[in-house]
């Protein structure tokens, strides 16, 4: 039985899974919103929230830890300069996941994952495009 097992294995070994999560986090930081499978989004959420918690500290040590986790100085710079200041008033829940239905090719459940602060919600964007 898999009681109290918190990790999503995603059908990959440990190094592949950690590289996948780091790359997804880097893309989320750079693009502010990404479309991926629901399970990958659920696996990414705690990783991304821990990155924001580190970035809100703003120390040199926190910056080095973030760079070590996501392997990108550019993304770390964006995280510290743009995203973390928007989240200063928020205690947790930095990431929002929208379910988007199934992918046509293989039927995988898809999701949209984005930052909660500083974003125009998906429904409002559709309404703006219609006008």
UniProtKB/Swiss-Prot annotation:
Please give a single GO biological process term from the UniProt record: translation
Q: Which GO terms describe its cellular component?
A: cytosolic large ribosomal subunit
Entry-linked Pfam families: Ribosomal_L17
Its domain of life reads Bacteria
Question: Which keywords appear in this protein's UniProt record, sorted alphabetically?
Answer: Ribonucleoprotein, Ribosomal protein
SUPFAM superfamilies the UniProt entry points to: Prokaryotic ribosomal protein L17 (SSF64263)
**One GO MF term:** structural constituent of ribosome
Family under the similarity heading: Belongs to the bacterial ribosomal protein bL17 family.
- Describe, as the record does, how this protein assembles with itself and its partners: Part of the 50S ribosomal subunit. Contacts protein L32.
Cite the NCBIfam families for this sequence.
L17
Q: Which HAMAP family match?
A: Ribosomal_bL17
What name has this protein been given in UniProt? Large ribosomal subunit protein bL17
Q: Which organism is it from?
A: Methylacidiphilum infernorum (isolate V4) (Methylokorus infernorum (strain V4))
